[in-house]
């Protein structure tokens, strides 16, 4: 048997990591990157460089390569595609053997795929557009603590989306006044209320005081309405120890659901908290604070659909997804694409919705999509048409901004939702007939009538920054 000779020096990445003949294995983790190379760096070399730097490569040949099977462990750039309307960038498809990654560790996957390679000088900009997690890897992750069906059973709510509200002002209220707002919203007809993402434990409202007043509000509202209620108590904290202390106290108070800011808190903390929630029977609401820092630039960063997949693997029962019709970024096709990635067991490749790979989730539970941000009663027909039943519609200002107060705002939203669900079940076109559906419902609901008058002129007519690059294949 001939001995492979070690040859020192620097060689082009394409010699090792460009493999257009490679057929990805079912067990490979596949990634699609949008690459904008530096002037003078051709596509194959740039794609191979990304494959190398995100897997086994370094800038020079090293003799220790001979101590392992580099052909097995290396990432392979196996396909390149044009980006429609952009002649400076291209899509590179890279396959990684599953054994490069620790089982069940979103942390480890991201450390490789979006690690040092994003500072690599050979590329001017780099964006991770999509990742295919093979079923063999999905099964190593715990996923959502409970999922959609179990949450419906716990909350005893079926046949419609859930209604929520983020308490406003998000900062500055005392714990007692905060609890009062929670009670009024839940008594008025909402299923959930919510801490905003930056409500932790500030001088004006320490976390323990907030938890106590909120628990009292929930128990009182449940007794008065006969319905199960919840409030997303944010347990995000400066350290894991403090996070678990807050979660444990929420459990002591018999709170059904807690909340975590999964990006600012980190995937390690989130996965640990999701496992705790599964063990204790606690639901977990996930906020995506900080996502736009990494996903809004269409040329550099990580697309939100990748963060969606990562969250489903790491664990959460709810995730904020944008609204399409509200104040936050997100076009309809893309949003419905990542909502399916949250909820469905199998999602086929669909470039018209920005989905680059088939994604098989096996039996992993789905996650409720949370529509939140600048929505009000006039949006209800479109929200139901876009998101369907397995969603939470959260009206912050659209509840608390009602001229008659919080309970009236909650009642208006509940009446609007139930009218739209009834119309949908009758086969009516929600988006075409939405105005008639709401105005007819308002004849028997003065709260809804006032809400419709208050927000009839409110629109968010801004174009989406991150547009789909639809590939004609």
From Swiss-Prot:
Co-factor(s): Mg(2+)
Keywords assigned: Calvin cycle, Carbon dioxide fixation, Lyase, Magnesium, Metal-binding, Monooxygenase, Oxidoreductase
Protein function: RuBisCO catalyzes two reactions: the carboxylation of D-ribulose 1,5-bisphosphate, the primary event in carbon dioxide fixation, as well as the oxidative fragmentation of the pentose substrate. Both reactions occur simultaneously and in competition at the same active site.
Sites annotated Transition state stabilizer: 327
Broad EC category: lyase
Binding site for substrate: 116, 166, 170, 288, 320, 372
One annotated GO molecular function: monooxygenase activity
Name of the featured protein: Ribulose bisphosphate carboxylase large chain 1
GO biological process: reductive pentose-phosphate cycle
Organism: Acidithiobacillus ferrooxidans (strain ATCC 23270 / DSM 14882 / CIP 104768 / NCIMB 8455)
Gene field: cbbL1
Note: The basic functional RuBisCO is composed of a large chain homodimer in a 'head-to-tail' conformation. In form I RuBisCO this homodimer is arranged in a barrel-like tetramer with the small subunits forming a tetrameric 'cap' on each end of the 'barrel'.
HAMAP family: RuBisCO_L_type1
Similarity comment: Belongs to the RuBisCO large chain family. Type I subfamily.
Reaction catalyzed: 2 (2R)-3-phosphoglycerate + 2 H(+) = D-ribulose 1,5-bisphosphate + CO2 + H2O; D-ribulose 1,5-bisphosphate + O2 = 2-phosphoglycolate + (2R)-3-phosphoglycerate + 2 H(+)
One Pfam family in the UniProt entry: RuBisCO_large
Catalytic site positions: 168, 287
Signal peptide: none
Annotated NCBIfam families: PRK04208.1 (NF003252)
Co-factor binding comment: Binds 1 Mg(2+) ion per subunit.
Residues with N6-carboxylysine modification: 194
């Amino acid at each position: 048997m001939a001995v492979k000779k070690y040859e020192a020096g620097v060689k082009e990445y394409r010699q090792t990591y460009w493999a257009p003949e490679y057929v990805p294995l079912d067990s490979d983790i596949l990634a699609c990157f949008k690459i904008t190379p530096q002037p003078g760096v051709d596509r194959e070399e740039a794609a191979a460089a990304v494959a190398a730097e995100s897997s086994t490569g370094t800038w020079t040949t090293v003799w220790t390569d001979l101590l392992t099977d580099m052909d097995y462990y290396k990432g392979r750039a196996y396909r390149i595609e044009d980006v429609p309307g952009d002649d400076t960038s291209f899509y590179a498809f890279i396959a990684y053997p599953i054994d490069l990654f620790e089982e069940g560790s979103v942390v480890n996957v991201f450390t490789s795929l979006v690690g040092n390679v994003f500072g690599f000088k050979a590329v001017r900009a780099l964006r991770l557009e999509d990742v295919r997690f093979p079923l063999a890897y999905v099964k190593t992750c715990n996923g959502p603590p409970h999922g959609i069906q179990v949450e419906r059973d716990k909350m005893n709510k079926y046949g419609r989306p859930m209604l929520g509200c983020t308490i406003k002002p998000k900062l500055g209220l005392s714990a007692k006044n905060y609890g009062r707002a929670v009670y009024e919203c839940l008594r008025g007809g909402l299923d959930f209320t919510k801490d905003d993402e930056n409500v932790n434990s500030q001088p004006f409202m320490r976390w323990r005081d907030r938890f106590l007043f909120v628990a009292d509000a929930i128990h009182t509202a449940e007794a008065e309405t006969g319905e199960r209620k919840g409030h997303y108590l944010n347990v995000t904290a400066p350290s894991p120890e403090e996070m678990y202390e807050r979660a444990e106290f929420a459990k002591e108070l018999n709170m059904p659901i807690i909340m975590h800011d999964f990006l600012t808190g980190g995937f390690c903390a989130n996965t640990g908290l999701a496992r705790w929630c599964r063990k204790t029977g606690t639901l977990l609401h996930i906020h995506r604070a900080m996502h736009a820092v990494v996903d809004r630039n269409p040329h550099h960063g990580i697309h939100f659909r990748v963060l969606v997949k990562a969250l489903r693997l790491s664990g959460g029962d709810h995730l904020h997804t944008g609204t399409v019709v509200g104040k936050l970024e997100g076009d309809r096709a893309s949003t419905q694409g990542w909502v399916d990635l949250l909820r469905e067991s199998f999602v086929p490749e669909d470039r018209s919705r920005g989905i680059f790979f088939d994604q098989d989730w096996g039996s992993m539970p789905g996650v409720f999509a949370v529509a939140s941000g600048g929505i009000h009663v006039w949006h209800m027909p479109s929200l139901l048409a876009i998101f369907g039943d397995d969603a939470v519609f959260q009206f912050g200002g659209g509840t608390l901004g009602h001229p008659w107060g919080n309970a009236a705002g909650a009642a208006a939203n509940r009446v609007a939702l139930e009218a739209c669900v009834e119309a949908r079940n009758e086969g009516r076109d929600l988006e075409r007939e939405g105005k008639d559906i709401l105005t007819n419902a308002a004849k028997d609901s003065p709260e809804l009538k006032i809400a419709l008058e208050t927000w009839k002129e409110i629109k968010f007519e801004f174009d989406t920054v991150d547009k789909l690059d639809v590939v004609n294949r």
